[in-house]
């Protein structure tokens, strides 16, 4: 039957020796009151810089991984075509109707008025969408970085 030792015990079984645990840069810990403040795990395992960083910034790392996961989900969902109904493609010489189901009256109206707007929409609307997408991509990055920095700042 094993006898439990108190935390302030300085016997050879409680203290790690360099023969049984060869650790680079290990310093001999004298038996003192500071040893009673450490846990047995802290006596055995030396402090690791990476572990300290992970402990200090755990929520910031989780938040950044969550933001990356949301960004990847956005990329995936934006790559899936959302047009399930009929739509049309027109070239200068032909007009083709694609899709499932009955043809939408709006599609027919867009085909009849293709001289006014060759691709079924106003060129100004397409330009506005491209300008907005150019402006919103850096803003989302700035928002994500500021959110990461806000979470990683120590209180």
From Swiss-Prot:
Participates in the transport of viral genome to neighboring plant cells directly through plasmodesmata, without any budding. TGBp2 and TGBp3 are necessary for intracellular delivery of TGBp1-containing vRNPs to plasmodesmata. Can gate plasmodesmata and increase their size exclusion limit. Induces host actin cytoskeleton network thickening, which probably plays a major role in virus cell-to-cell movement. It is found in: Host cell junction, Host plasmodesma; Host endoplasmic reticulum membrane; Host cytoplasm, Host cytoskeleton. The keyword Transmembrane helix applies. It is a multi-pass membrane protein. This is Movement protein TGB3. Residues 150-155 are annotated as: Required for attachment to the host plasmodesmata-associated membrane compartments. Its main location: host cell. Interacts with movement proteins TGB1 and TGB2. TGB1-TGB3-TGB2 complex formation is enhanced by ATP hydrolysis. One of its GO terms (cellular component) is host cell endoplasmic reticulum membrane. It comes from Barley stripe mosaic virus. Residues 1-59, 152-155 are cytoplasmic.
